[in-house]
Swiss-Prot record:
Residues 136-230 are annotated as: Disordered. Residues 136-172 have a biased composition (Basic and acidic residues). Residues 220-230 have a biased composition (Basic residues). It comes from the Eukaryota. This is UPF0329 protein ECU06_0040. Signal peptide: none annotated. Belongs to the UPF0329 family. InterPro entries: DUF3654, UPF0329. It comes from Encephalitozoon cuniculi (strain GB-M1).
């Protein structure tokens, strides 16, 4: 063996020895086992602690961002239902868990499920996540403290009211026992009137402001925002069609060019109207914070036009049933560059089928073949439901609701669609 060959041999042997020591290090495998246990427990806590719609949101958000790794064959990955595997520094995760505790570790795992790449998880990112968790806990504690104070305040008000009632009753008894009631009556009546006015003033702060009519719907939940941040949308006739009566819808579909809707029974049309007649969603879609609710599901070309799909997680309550799923919005741009909504539907979706709902290939295959882009469209800001339909929109911190009510008895809710805010990505 020449000196050169001997040198190469020794280098290979040294490298093999180091790699073998790395692979067979008991300390390393114990560390990996500990990290795996921590991550598995965090996943379990995350999934068990979420409502169905929250878990759908987590899976959908992560699925939008993840891609299959080249090392896996596509078929194998699909069979295993893996979206992605993540390579992350196990020492970093273990140190983070020991330094900050389980809540920060759980948030790190949640961010991985939401699509955070392992290469982006470093010490600086861990510290940032820890700061977010601390701030979240602080706000939670403040909210708890505020709730306790409000509860104590309500109890004190009730106690004060009870004491006033007792005092009033005692005065009334004393009054009945006195002589010369006629002389003292006016002053006592004035005193009772003053007490009554004070009680009414105290209760005045508890009266809620009445909802205001906005764009054909009653809107609750905060001041009306300026139009500066609102987005432009138009509504295609095939979407507006679902706001009509079932009989009229059937008549128009039977005369139309879309084969998928021709010949449907009136019962089928009524069932489909429940999930398609959700045009009130455009109030949210046009708002400046629509991106907090809707995820971009990608673009593709079909039927001669470029289309874009957006989805949001939601729940539909109707007929005593509650269904979780996604709100689908399909758009194309008209000649002026304004997005036209040609597809709008609530699709009931289970945890197991969320992958198909957000898969661009599946979405494209199931989409309508050709949309008549020349048909007259309506500006979304001018849309008003047909006369006799009573609905209102309610915007809250983490959700947006559309509530349909019985026009004859507005206390009766016929249908409710709730659109949920997307999970927080750090």
């Amino acid at each position: 063996m020449s000196e050169e060959e001997k040198k190469v041999y020794l280098e290979d042997w040294r490298s093999a020895k180091e790699w073998g020591g790395f692979l067979y290090s008991i300390e390393r495998w114990e560390r990996i086992a500990e990290v795996e246990k921590i991550v598995c427990n965090a996943c379990k806590e995350i999934c068990l602690g979420l409502r169905e719609e929250e878990l759908l949101g987590l899976l959908a958000e992560g699925g939008m961002k993840k891609t299959l790794k080249e090392e896996f064959s596509e078929d194998k990955a699909k069979d295993a239902r893996y979206l992605e595997y993540i390579v992350v520094d196990d020492v970093l995760l273990l140190d983070a868990h020991r330094e900050y505790g389980g809540e920060v570790t759980k948030e790190l795992v949640r961010q991985m499920l939401l699509g955070k790449e392992g290469k982006d998880i470093d010490k600086r990112y861990v510290d940032r996540v820890a700061g977010v968790v601390r701030e979240r806990q602080r706000k939670r504690e403040e909210e708890t403290e505020r709730s306790v104070k409000e509860l104590v305040g309500d109890e004190e008000k009730a106690k004060s009211k009870e004491e006033k009632a007792k005092s009033k009753e005692e005065k009334a008894k004393s009054k009945r026992g006195r002589k010369g009631k006629s002389a003292s009556a006016p002053s006592e009546q004035e005193e009772e009137k003053k007490e009554s006015e004070v009680e009414e003033a105290e209760q005045g702060g508890e009266v809620e402001a009445l909802p205001v009519e906005v764009g054909g719907a009653r809107s609750k939940g905060g001041k009306k925002k300026s139009k500066g941040g609102r987005k432009c949308f138009k509504i295609h006739r095939r979407v507006l069609r679902w706001t009509k009566s079932p009989e009229k819808i059937k008549e128009e579909w039977d005369k139309g060019s879309e084969e998928r809707w021709k010949g449907r029974s009136l019962e089928e049309i009524k069932e489909q109207k429940i999930v398609h007649d959700i045009t009130g969603v455009l109030e949210l879609l046009r708002s400046e914070d629509a991106d907090r609710f809707f995820m971009d599901a990608g673009k593709y070309r079909k039927g001669g036009s470029e289309r874009q799909r957006m989805v949001a997680i939601g729940a539909l309550e109707t007929g005593g049933q509650r269904m979780t799923g996604v709100v689908e919005v399909g758009t194309f741009k008209d000649g002026d560059g304004c997005p036209v909504v040609y597809h709008l539907r609530f699709k009931p979706t289970s945890i197991g089928s969320i992958g198909d709902v957000i898969n661009p290939g599946v979405v494209e295959a199931s989409d309508v073949g050709r949309v008549d882009e020349g048909e007259e469209c309506e500006d979304a800001d001018k849309f008003v439901y047909p006369k006799g339909v009573r609905f209102e929109t309610v915007k809250e911190t983490g959700s947006f609701q559309i509530v349909w009510k019985n026009p004859s008895d507005t206390s009766e809710v016929l249908r409710r669609l709730i659109v949920y805010c997307r999970p927080c990505v750090i």
